[in-house]
Amino acid sequence: MARPKRGNQVPPPPTEDEWDLRYATKEALAFPEMEKQFPGNCAEAKSRLKVAPTTRTDVQEKLRGSLGTRAIAGSEMDQWQYDIASGARLWYCVDPEKRIVWLTLAAMGHPRSTASKGKRAPRNR
């Protein structure tokens, strides 16, 4: 299988009533590797995002603050997070007019940009 590129569709293609999943950034291009490590969780994530990308669940939430919106192709969109597995996260933006879910980040560890600044977890002694 060829390596994905920005703008490419995430396979498989959507059915008539599903949302289209696409790669928006180079940081999202790690999603196929994530699928290899967490195949079941990623398959469930794709299914949920194709049907209800803006539904808040125990694994899906809108990001807050400066991370809550992002510009893609000149349009400002809400940015969401899907918790694939402990530490593995998928960020995405939703374009309701075109019914496209733009993947913006596939991170195997917790993204640094969501960590609280100046606060560290207590060390185990």
Task: Annotate each PLM feature.
Residues 1-88, 94-125:
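Basic, Lys/Arg-enriched alpha-helical interface segments
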